[in-house]
């Protein structure tokens, strides 16, 4: 096997052209909105964080009523917490004792790995599996571009989603805010629809029809809210190509749910194994990649009654991030256990399977950390997020513990993919790291690929590729 591409192949900063350094000056980027969410959070105290279930609770609720409210607002674990609360122990000791017995059984089962994934879905656990770096504390938790016209949605740590166009500013951005929308993990604009966006959060799915009259300071209601079974939080979601089906995953559920919003129907894709953590629908609509909180991941065939192939990554890890090539023939992913970039190849509606070698998961790049300048600045290590540009020429990688962004050149052929390290991007300061990245869709075939970077400082940067 040929030697893997690695980060040591990149030239040091001192030899890079100006274009590959911290900024590139492209005239059309000057018309993009200037966004710094940290400044907006400080300047707009009205954009406070809302938490579901905190509004107007009667002080004289009985025990059973409190437990029922906890179940509908927070699911099983909130119910168990309420059953074991000091107030319940005082008013209904038998219920509290029953709660203790249930908690002891679940603790024993988890310790014996009888129910290894049965545990409370805390914000810390959600943060472990989302693609956003330092999700708990990051000013920006997610970015999503509209597929059909210039419109960028930015989800903040304050549970507010701000919608920016080319004419938007911090004071004129459309705002989506609701008590039913907390701990946002993902967002997606609906394909073939100009104004509908769905937001995945602790409470489930919030569907919004974006209206320019929605401004900061007003609390509004989503047009629809879909609750996940058992009131679990959404941790990943993806629309199919034509916007008729929405796939969702939760780290508390083994099933992938396929929603049909127009009919209100949902179909669970059930398999034994650990809960789902990450979904990626292929651009050609043929395949749905589904990672789990453990080594197992699956690739579902969307045209053969949801048949699936089961795969396993390296021991001790799970798939942290993945992305499809624009043509849909290649899938790249990285495990949390090792800094190696892997690929799977898809041709003619089936996984290559004529021989054992063809069906292997192939490593194509070594992402181990290395020093890049005289100051021994490190780049690389365990990957946080992958993003592939719409033209298929560049792959961008961010990392969990180092602050530079690695850029690889990619060369896609029908049956082969080649990759080589190109250069690095860095923030305005050495301490600034990328929280989330995504590419703007191509609105015209000859558009440049524009990478959108949410930095830990709260600012949004746009970087245009050739």
Swiss-Prot record:
Protein's cellular compartments: Nucleus, Nuclear pore complex; Cytoplasm, Cytoskeleton, Spindle
UniProt lineage: Eukaryota, Metazoa, Ecdysozoa, Arthropoda, Hexapoda
Primary subcellular site in the record, as a coarse category: nucleus
Keywords: Cytoplasm, Cytoskeleton, mRNA transport, Nuclear pore complex, Nucleus, Protein transport, Repeat, Translocation, Transport, WD repeat
GO biological process: microtubule bundle formation; mitotic spindle assembly; mRNA transport; nucleocytoplasmic transport; positive regulation of protein localization to spindle pole body; protein transport
Signal peptide interval: none
Name the record gives this protein: Aladin
UniProt WD repeat ranges: 135-174, 179-218, 229-269, 271-310, 378-418
Function summary: Involved in mitotic spindle assembly.
GO cellular component entries: cytoplasm; endomembrane system; mitotic spindle; nuclear pore; spindle pole
InterPro entries on file: Aladin (IPR045139), WD40/YVTN_repeat-like_dom_sf (IPR015943), WD40_rpt (IPR001680)
Pfam families for the chain: Beta-prop_Aladin
């Amino acid at each position: 096997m040929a030697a893997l591409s690695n980060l040591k192949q990149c030239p040091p900063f001192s030899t890079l052209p100006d274009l590959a350094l911290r900024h590139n000056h492209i005239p059309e980027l000057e018309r993009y909105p200037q966004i710094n969410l940290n400044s907006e959070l400080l300047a707009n105290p009205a954009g406070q964080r809302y938490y579901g279930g905190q509004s107007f609770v009667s002080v004289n609720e009985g025990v059973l009523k409190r437990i029922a409210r906890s179940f509908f607002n927070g699911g099983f674990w909130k119910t168990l917490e309420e059953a074991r609360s000091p107030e319940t122990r005082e008013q209904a000791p038998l219920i509290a004792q029953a709660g203790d017995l249930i908690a002891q059984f679940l603790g024993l089962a988890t310790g014996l790995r009888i129910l290894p994934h049965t545990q409370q879905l805390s914000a810390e656990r959600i943060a472990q599996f989302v693609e956003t770096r330092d999700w708990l504390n990051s000013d920006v938790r997610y970015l999503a571009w509209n597929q059909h016209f210039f419109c960028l949605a930015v989800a903040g740590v304050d549970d507010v989603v701000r919608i920016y166009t080319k004419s938007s500013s911090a004071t004129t951005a459309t705002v989506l805010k609701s008590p039913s929308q907390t701990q946002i993990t993902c967002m997606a604009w609906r394909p073939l629809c100009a104004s509908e966006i769905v937001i995945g959060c602790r409470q489930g799915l919030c569907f919004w029809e974006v209206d320019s009259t929605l401004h900061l300071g007003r609390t509004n209601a989503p047009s629809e809210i879909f609750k996940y079974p058992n009131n679990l939080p959404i941790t990943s979601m993806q629309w199919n190509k034509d916007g008729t089906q929405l796939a969702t995953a939760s780290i508390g559920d083994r099933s992938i749910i396929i929603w049909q919003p127009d009919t209100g129907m949902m179909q669970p894709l059930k398999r034994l194994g650990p809960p789902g953590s990450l979904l990626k629908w292929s651009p050609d609509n043929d395949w749905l990649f589904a990672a789990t909180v453990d080594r197992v991941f699956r690739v579902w065939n969307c045209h053969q009654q949801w048949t699936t192939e089961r795969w396993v990554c390296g021991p001790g890890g799970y798939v942290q991030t993945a992305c499809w090539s624009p043509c849909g023939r290649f899938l790249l992913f990285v495990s949390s256990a090792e800094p190696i970039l892997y690929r799977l190849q898809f041709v003619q509606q089936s996984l290559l399977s004529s021989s054992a070698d063809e069906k292997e998961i192939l490593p194509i790049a070594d992402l181990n950390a290395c020093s890049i300048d005289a100051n021994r600045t490190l780049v690389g290590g365990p990957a946080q997020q992958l993003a592939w540009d719409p033209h298929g020429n560049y792959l961008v990688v961010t990392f969990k513990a180092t602050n530079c962004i690695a850029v690889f050149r990619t060369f896609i052929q029908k049956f082969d993919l080649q990759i080589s390290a190109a250069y690095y991007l860095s923030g305005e300061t050495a301490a600034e790291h990328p929280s989330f990245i995504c590419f703007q869709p191509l609105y015209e075939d000859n558009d440049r690929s524009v990478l959108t970077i949410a930095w830990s400082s709260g600012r949004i940067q746009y970087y245009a590729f050739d």
